[in-house]
């Protein structure tokens, strides 16, 4: 079996039927012309935000990570492992793709520990066992994995989806693409940066050009590139016509170098 490709979905993608239609059409085209197994990892911050707003619950973030108190983890689990995950499975079904919905704890695929007590139920993802997902891939299924994990003590954890995708890529020896709302990392003039090193990223963070959630995304991509020993791409889902080429290894956004 070829090494898998993990496609991490993020941003407002899950909120846009047009975007999901484009994405799944691209996935169908890719699967028809390539034998390479695919895995989807997703968060769903927009789904969570809508739910929290409807319940009049405050959304707090610290260093770009969502603070998840004990009384909110059940709600966030329902939004990510429930609504967001099953929405993607429904789109896969619509496009005749045999998909299986998972969370990080299934088959111990990704190990999770608590990241920081101040963040509450927020987990740190580390590589786990490839057995379950490899078995699904060998049988032609598309695993769709939410970024909810569980600790060895049985505590549910909300994991940053970029970090979750990185840990799963390390588990499977997979390549990784981080799809987001933006076409890559932008410089101070709003121009896309084609390649990014750790030194360049540190410089842009110090200058305040890379901020908030993008810091988390860039650090996750740098961590992934180092862990995997190969480049990681950050790109946009907005250009559907480019997605099959992107999935095939053509750089379309910002390529993060190890």
From Swiss-Prot:
Signal peptide: none annotated. Disulfide bonds: none annotated. Substrate binds at residues 44-45, 66, 158. The keyword Cytoplasm applies. Changing residue 162 to E: Reduces activity over 99%. No effect on KM for N-acetyl-L-glutamate and ATP. It comes from Escherichia coli (strain K12). Its EC number is 2.7.2.8. It is found in: Cytoplasm. Its main location: cytoplasm. Catalyzes the ATP-dependent phosphorylation of N-acetyl-L-glutamate. The lineage of its organism: Bacteria, Pseudomonadati, Pseudomonadota, Gammaproteobacteria, Enterobacterales. Homodimer. It comes from the Bacteria. This is Acetylglutamate kinase. Pathway: Amino-acid biosynthesis; L-arginine biosynthesis; N(2)-acetyl-L-ornithine from L-glutamate: step 2/4. HAMAP family: ArgB. One of its GO terms (molecular function) is acetylglutamate kinase activity. ATP binds at residues 181-186, 209-211. GO terms for biological process: arginine biosynthetic process via ornithine; DNA damage response; L-arginine biosynthetic process. The record marks 8, 217 as: Transition state stabilizer.
């Amino acid at each position: 079996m070829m090494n898998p490709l993990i496609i991490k979905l993020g941003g407002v993608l899950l909120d846009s039927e047009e975007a999901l239609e484009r994405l799944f059409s691209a996935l169908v085209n890719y699967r028809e012309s390539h034998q390479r197994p695919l895995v989807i990892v997703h968060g769903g911050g927009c789904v969570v935000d809508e739910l929290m707003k409807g319940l009049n619950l405050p959304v707090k973030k610290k260093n770009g990570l969502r603070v998840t108190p004990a009384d909110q983890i059940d709600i966030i689990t329902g939004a990510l492992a429930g609504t967001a995950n099953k929405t993607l499975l429904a789109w896969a079904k619509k496009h005749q793709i045999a998909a299986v919905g998972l969370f990080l704890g299934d088959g111990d695929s990704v190990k999770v520990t608590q990241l920081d007590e101040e963040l509450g139920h927020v987990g740190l993802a580390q590589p786990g066992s490839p057995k379950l997902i490899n078995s699904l891939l060998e049988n032609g299924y598309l695993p769709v994995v939410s970024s909810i994990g569980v600790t060895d003590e049985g505590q549910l954890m909300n994991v940053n989806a970029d970090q979750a995708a990185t840990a799963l890529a390390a588990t499977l020896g997979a390549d990784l693409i981080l799809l987001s709302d933006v076409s890559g990392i932008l410089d101070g003039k709003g121009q896309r940066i084609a390649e990014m090193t750790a030194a360049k990223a540190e410089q842009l963070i110090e200058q305040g050009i890379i901020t908030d959630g993008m810091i988390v995304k860039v650090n996750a991509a740098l961590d992934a590139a180092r862990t995997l020993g190969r480049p990681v791409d950050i790109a946009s889902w907005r250009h559907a016509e480019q997605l099959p080429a992107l999935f095939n290894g053509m750089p379309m956004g910002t390529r993060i170098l190890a």
